[in-house]
Each structure stands twice: as structure tokens, then as C-alpha cells.
Curated annotation (Swiss-Prot):
GO molecular function terms listed in the Swiss-Prot or TrEMBL record: DNA binding; translation repressor activity
Protein name in the entry: Transcriptional repressor ILP1
InterPro entries, A to Z: GCFC2-like (IPR012890), GCFC_dom (IPR022783)
Biased composition range(s): Low complexity: 25-47
Amino acid sequence: MGSNRPKNFRRRGDDGGDEIDGKVATPSSKPTSTLSSSKPKTLSASAPKKKLLSFADDEEEEEDGAPRVTIKPKNGRDRVKSSSRLGVSGSSHRHSSTKERRPASSNVLPQAGSYSKEALLELQKNTRTLPYSRSSANAEPKVVLKGLIKPPQDHEQQSLKDVVKQVSDLDFDEEGEEEQHEDAFADQAAIIRAKKERMRQSRSAPAPDYISLDGGIVNHSAVEGVSDEDADFQGIFVGPRPQKDDKKGVFDFGDENPTAKETTTSSIYEDEDEEDKLWEEEQFKKGIGKRMDEGSHRTVTSNGIGVPLHSKQQTLPQQQPQMYAYHAGTPMPNVSVAPTIGPATSVDTLPMSQQAELAKKALKDNVKKLKESHAKTLSSLTKTDENLTASLMSITALESSLSAAGDKYVFMQKLRDFISVICDFMQNKGSLIEEIEDQMKELNEKHALSILERRIADNNDEMIELGAAVKAAMTVLNKHGSSSSVIAAATGAALAASTSIRQQMNQPVKLDEFGRDENLQKRREVEQRAAARQKRRARFENKRASAMEVDGPSLKIEGESSTDESDTETSAYKETRDSLLQCADKVFSDASEEYSQLSKVKARFERWKRDYSSTYRDAYMSLTVPSIFSPYVRLELLKWDPLHQDVDFFDMKWHGLLFDYGKPEDGDDFAPDDTDANLVPELVEKVAIPILHHQIVRCWDILSTRETRNAVAATSLVTNYVSASSEALAELFAAIRARLVEAIAAISVPTWDPLVLKAVPNTPQVAAYRFGTSVRLMRNICMWKDILALPVLENLALSDLLFGKVLPHVRSIASNIHDAVTRTERIVASLSGVWTGPSVTRTHSRPLQPLVDCTLTLRRILEKRLGSGLDDAETTGLARRLKRILVELHEHDHAREIVRTFNLKEAV
């Protein structure tokens, strides 16, 4: 350590006052040597009561032999203030490199913070740029300021004039300079306010560009005993350079050579950059840094040299250990320590063991940080890999999306052209299909109308002749009674009337301009119908004889099984129909398979739905495809003859292709909101039902059992696809009921007296035929039991037909017990499955009570016959047949009575 007496070193920077422990250090009367522009003067210890202020201008003047300026403070406070003031931007202080600095002789040893050559070299070796720091009064380093000093404001300069008056011992060598500085002093309060304002404005300014040689950042107020106002006043003159016409601030001496200063500053910057590069290279070579703080007995200094702490500093809170050096512009930690006076303790001067510990500790810290950095690098690498993978996936997805978009565009363009072509195609072919459909409908209507007209003409021929004959016979019988002679007379009258009517019905010869008889064809048709009637009568007689011999209800009677169709009409109808179907097969023959084949069209739309379902849905294709597929279905349904063929839709090609249209490929069922599931039902409703409706209304022969059976099958088929709420289906049911009502109204069953049947020829055959026709109609009505409601059937078959027209005929022939029993059996057989038979309960057979009463009437007739002594095999056979009728009607009690009455050996 050096001498213990207080040393006064020249200071540079915003340091505090010069009072240390109550003592005031004053400058010596004369300097010991002349320093360069970058080195401060050293003070002698011979004048303890005076202090010399150092400025760059003073130093230059000293080099040139100019007299120096001394300050004579009046009191301790003034001396403290004057020792801490700096020159403003007009000062020529510069930070030069170490080589340019000339050594100055000093009467003291280099202390901590001094500008000795050894200290600066050690500082350059171990320390990078250090932040701004404030040293204590004990250290008092010599600092060279550079940069511009913000000039004080005019009002501040005016207020500083009062300070000049308080400084009475200022002695400048040049009177002009003394007068200039006397005007630059201000009062203390104004200086404090200006200092606070500038410190607030310069907080964002960069750190000082000089190297502090203090022993660390020290709280000068606590160490030196400087007041808060003095501490706030320190560093007030740091700021931008004032303008040329501005007045100089406190201690602001004129700068007569600014260009030289700027050149020096630029060289300083270059030297600093070179020193920084050298320092960085040296640090990389060393591999480890120097610790600036070690343990509780060392503190961090601005020059990288550890300074021991005073014993009274041990009570301060322990600061976090800093790294080896502070970067330029980075503020130092707020560590307040008091450096000791004496030579600095360098890391290199420590024992080897301590240096090894420091190096080991630094190495461990570096390894720890390296591991942390490695972990962060690995984490960053992992995230980078993840991001790269995600990016690659995104790129792949985008490429796939782009390729899919391209495929979609191509597909949509082709599909647009396809739909455009197929719409035009269907518009052209649709007229041909409609023409063939109209011709097919016309053919069916003609075929049905020919049968109906022939039946009506035949009935009219018979009824006209029989009507006249019956009327003549009834006239004779009503006048003369029922004797055999009267019956013979009635027969003669009937024949005469019949012959007369036949002659009137014969068409006379009517020649046209070419000599052809226009009525010849009509007469031939009448003759053909008469011959057909004769054949039917002959068949009836044969069946009646067989019924007398055969004991059973299975034998049908005349009129019950006749279809009223001629072989010639049937063959002509089939020939014309086949030619129309051949024309239909050639409708699409001139088109390519892409448009003419339903399977190709279906596959095209199914691919659209499968690959681009959203666009398929947005285009409302579920509402459009029925219209597109409809021509193909209509063309195939031309072959569908629902009245003459019992064909299921499953046997048709269009149904097999469109039944699973739009169904998922995985075999799952349709989605609830997929309207393509209703494609086939919609086609059935819009295409098939209209065809069937036309056949029912215009072509159905209700008396034909075969056509009725096929019509029932076709109606049942369409009801399986279409809901009951369908309007088309409701219209179909209404048409069926209307046709049945019309048929019941058109039929008539004669109720002639038995005497008339005996007297008038052919009346029994006609009555039997009409009865057989009514039974046939009743049986055809009962075929609709699974389609029409039971009350509707009951009203049609029972109320209107059975009770209104059939039973009166049976009652009229009751005296002819054989015919009456036979016809009753046919009635019960026609109602089987609906109101009669083993599968029907008694509840359903109750509406047949009139038929039961008629059967009981026949039983009483047989009982009378048995009571008259006619107990023959015929009577027993009729009784047995009545018993079976009652069993079918669920009248078992009456059946048992017949068994007991006629001694039948049969169980009921």
C-alpha cells in the first residue's frame, strides 16, 4: 500500500466532491511536470489546503508554457464543488491510445484507478469496454471526457453569474478568459435543476466512450460524505456541443481547433476498435474469462481488477457475481464499495491454487452454460425437425391438393360437356320415346275396346231376342195359367217374337257407288256372335250334366271362366306389339355406348358422387338424376304389360342398375339425408304408376280373371316402392274403385220365373251365363283384399253385387233346387278368403247373413222334398252340399241339423 495520508488526484468524469472523511484535499502550488493532452497533472502533497482544477485547455497551455488557472475556494463547500467541475464540449480532452500517451513523472506510486502505464496495459489486457462508473473520493482517477457537452440554457447561464461572484480566488493567466468564465457561473439551485433535466434527457444516450479507472461503482454520497445536491450536480455538463453563437457554459473555454479534435476522436475510435478486436482474439485464445468478483472479500471494478472491501462494507447485501467483463454500454450493477488506497490486486498476482480454482470454476460455469446451450440447441433442432416435417407434410398435402384440384377441374370440364350432350341427346330421343309410348297405349286401348264392344254387342243381341220372347211368353202365362198346354203356347209365342226381332236386327243390303254392300260386314259379325253363343250353350249343357253327376263345388259354370277373347284378336295384338318393341330397341342405336347405355351413364354420375360429393350435392343431382334416367326406364317399360304379364321390377335391367345407385362402396346403407336412396321409388312413382294407371282406366277388362290378377300384382308391386301418401298412388286406387263400381253397375243377372225358363228357349243358358259373369266379377273384386280396405270391398262385393243382384237370382230359381244349390256353392267359393273359408273367423262372416238365410231356404226345400217321400241319392247329395256351404259360412249349428235331418254320416 502507499502512504496513508490523503492523496489528491486529478479527476475526470462526473465524480463527487473532494472531501474525504472530513478532510479537504487542495492542489499544490505548482505542477511537478507537464503532461500530454490525454494525461492529467499530478498534485504535490505540499499544499493540503488548495486544489488544482485540470482541463484540457490548461494542459495544452502548460505544454505551450502558458500560465495555469488556479481556483481559490472560499470554503470547503466551494472547494468540493470546484474540484468536481469539468469543461464542456469546448474542451480539447481526447481519449488517445496507449502508445500516444507520454509518461508523466509522479511523486506517488500507481494507485487503483491511476493512469499508469502498467495499469492501462493490464486494463487493456483483461478488460473490454466498461460501462460508465463513479469512483470514490479516495481513488480520484484521472478521466478524460470526450464528446459534446450540452450547453446550458440562457437562463441557466444568467443564473450562474451569481456563482462567479462567490468564487473570488479564481486566477486565470489570461484576463479575457477570466471574464468569459465569470459570466458562465450560476447559482447552485439552477445547476441542480439543469443537471436533473439533462440526466433525464440523456438516459437513452450511449455510455461514455472512456475507460473508467475507478475501483468500482461507489456510492460517493455514502463514502465521501457528499450531499445529495452535490451528487446530483455531478455529470451535469455531459451533453451535445453548443452552437457557435451560443454562450459558453461553466468552465467552457473556447475551442479554437475543432477539426483537430474531430480527427483525434476518429483516431481514438479506430484505436478502440483495434483494441476490441485484439481483446476478442485474446479471449478466444484463452478459452476462459477472468472473474471480476470472487467471494465476499472482493468486488467488481470497472477495470477488471478485484479490489478488497473495507471491513465496514461487509454489512452490504451480497451482490450476484458478475462475469469477467461488461460490454460497452451495459450499466454496472449497483454495487457500492469503497476501494482501498494502494496497489491493485490483479488476478495474475494470485497464488496458482486460487487461479486454478478460479479457472476451474469458470470452466465449470462455461461447461454448464454449454450444456444449457446444447440442450436449447437440441430443443431448437427438435422443433426445427418438427416444423420441417410439418412443412414437408404441408407441401405434400398442397401438392396432392393441387393434383386433386387439377383432376377435379378436368373431370368437371368433361362432365359438363357430357351433361350438355346428354341433355341434347335426351331432348331429341325423348320425342321418339313418347311417340312409341303413345302408339303402345293406343294399341292396348284398341285391344281392350274390341273385347268390350264384342261383349256388349253379344249381350245386346241376346237380350233383344230374349226380351221379346220372354215378354210374349209372360203374356200367355199370365192369362192362361201354368198348365203344360199353356207353357207350350207360351213357347210358341216366344219363338215367334224372337224370329221377328232377329229379322229386324238383320242389316238390309246397302250398296255404295262401287256396288259393295256396306252392311255385309255387320251381318257377318252378328252371325259370328250367334254361332259363338250356340257354342257356349252347348258347353253349358255339358257342364250342367257333369255337375249333376259330380258331387262337388269345384266345377265352374258357363260365364265364370270365359275371357271373351278370340284367338284372332289376340294374335293381331301380339304382332303389332312386337313391331313397336322392335322400333323401341333402335331408338338409341345411332348413339355411342357412353350415352345409349344406362350402365355407362350411371357409372359416370356415381364417380362424380364418390369423388366429389360436395359438388354433387351442391348441383342438386339427387333431384336431377331421375329426369336423366327416366328415358332409359320409359324405353324399357314399354315391354311391361301389367295386365297380361306378371313381371316383377327385379327382373328388369333398369331396376338392377339403379337399385344401388349412389350406395357407398363399403356396403353400408344410404345415409339418412341421402336422397339418392329414393331414386327407384321416385322412378316408379313418376314412370311406372302412370303406365299402370292408364292400363287400369282404359285397358282393364274387369271380368277377365287373368287381367285382374295381373293388375292386382302390378298394383301391389308399385305400393312396395311408393308410400301410401303418394298422390299418384291415391289416384290409382281411386281409378280402381271407380272401375269396379262401373262394372257392377253394368252387369245384370235375370230373375225370371221358373215357368218362363221352361217356356222360353235359351233363357236358362242366358241366366246361367249372366250369373256366372256376376260371380266372376265378385271373385275379381275379392282379389283386391290386400290393397283396398275391407269396408270398401264389403260395400262393392256384398252390398252392391251379392245382395243387390246375385241373391235375387238364386231366390228366383230356388224351386230348381239343383241349380240353386250349385249357384250358391259358386257364390261361397268366390267369397273364399275374405268372408268365407277356414281362414276367416265368424266375425268377418257376419255380413253374409242374407246368404245364410238363402241357404237355409234351400235346406227347407230339401226337407220338404224328403218329407214327400223322395229319399233318393240326389236329395242326400244336395243335403251334403248344403251342409258344406253352412260350414264355410261358419254356421255349424245349422250344418249339424242338416246332418241329423238327412242322416248324413259326416262330421261337421
